[in-house]
Amino acid sequence: MKPLKLNYFFIGIITLLLALALWPSIPWRSSQDVQLRQILSRGELRISTVNSPLTYAMSNGSPTGLDYELAKRFADYLGVKLVVSSRKNLDELFDDLDGDDADLLAAGLIYNHERLERFRAGPTYYSISQQMVYRLGSPRPKTLDKLQGRLVVTSGSAHAATLRDLKAEKYPQLSWESASDQSTQELLKQVADGKLDYTLGDSVTIGLMQRIHPQLAVAFDLSDEEPVIWYMRRSHDDSLSAALLDFFSQLVEDGTLARLEEKYLGHVGEFDYVDTTTFLSAIDETLPDLRPLFEKYATDIDWKLLAAISYQESHWNPLATSPTGVRGLMMLTRNTAESLNVTDRVDPEQSIRGGAQYMSHMMQKMPDTIPEDEKIWFALASYNMGYAHLLDARKLTEKQKGNPDSWVDVKMRLPMLSQKRYYTQTTYGYARGHEAYNYVENIRRYMVSLEGYLIEKEAKVQQQTQIALGYPAVPLTKVPE
């Protein structure tokens, strides 16, 4: 999969031009601001979305997701309460707009020119490419006229619109089926399971799905980079659109959009089939015995993150030993173990307890100016290459006009610490910054795989239990976008 492209300059320019075009004619706080006035009078911003870790989900009792966080910030910007409705499919989403049951659709939707006849597009907040997907091991098609099997896409989606355009322009013999009751994620899973030959997906969704279904493979791209947007009702009143454009312009300018996209999309780029399949096997074979210990001692971080750190360190091998002498599930040094009262580094419980305590200590060392949800990445980089070198990376970031408290800015400077023209300017000199960069990114990818795999596995168990008891099976929980 090619790396995700987040063109903030392009997004900022387009957003600014649109805002300037709208602002002189209809200021969003004028007497004509009907849509916005209704939201302010109601005291609520109503959004409809779909349930997935990328858009909106509950994690440890709190809502999370890129679209949720953006919507919450927009509601705060307007000074109103956010009300979220989760829907099953595209038809239900757009029905909410038609029926005035939602002000915005915030669901990671691709720009679809067919929808613009009835709905208005909001600003771009990241971009994707549409891709043809097949199952690894099957013949790889090179073009649309080389497909040999069933192609199914979600009805009403941008993928269906793309196929209609391509059929009219170049491939008159092209045929496919549309599924109104299945999401893109569900169709991708069918391809991974060998139940379907082909489907279309966006590069981000595919990249995340490959973390739990490594059998998914990209045959070719069907589009260049396309915008992901929110939708609102089309009307002569531009007040809500103008407010949204102004809001996103501020997010681009102050770096908030870049930080949120790093949080949810920054780990999507690279995919290693062998490493992923090995990790998924370890989840089934090794993790069940260790999970109670991770859950017991992960007091300051998610237990799945602690498990991902341990896998990166030792591949969950309690007897792991490195040439430098670090040992155990968390690969503790002798000095670190002694400071944490760990008497036996190869004892699983002692190692996990010590590792959790050490990570908590490292996070506490991070400056308060760093956002809470980013401190863990700084702490992990510090753990890998040393706190002093992390200080150098932050100073280098600031010197280059970046934000030393933003992980998206600092992580790009880590590899520079091994380049002479940069490390000669630092206080503590040369560091294997590229290793720290890869270390953190690997842990983030393991975390995504673990979360998605467990969600899907637990949903299957629930469904099988219901069938065994004679109850109708509920639909499986959607896997990560």
Swiss-Prot record:
GO terms for biological process: cell wall macromolecule catabolic process; cell wall organization; peptidoglycan catabolic process. It comes from the Bacteria. CDD domains: MLTF-like, PBP2_YfhD_N. It is a peripheral membrane protein. Its EC number is 4.2.2.n1. SUPFAM superfamilies: Lysozyme-like (SSF53955), Periplasmic binding protein-like II (SSF53850). Residues 22-268 are annotated as: Non-LT domain. Residues 1-21 form the signal peptide. The N-terminal domain does not have lytic activity and probably modulates enzymatic activity. The C-terminal domain is the catalytic active domain. This is Membrane-bound lytic murein transglycosylase F. It comes from Pectobacterium atrosepticum (strain SCRI 1043 / ATCC BAA-672) (Erwinia carotovora subsp. atroseptica). The gene is mltF.
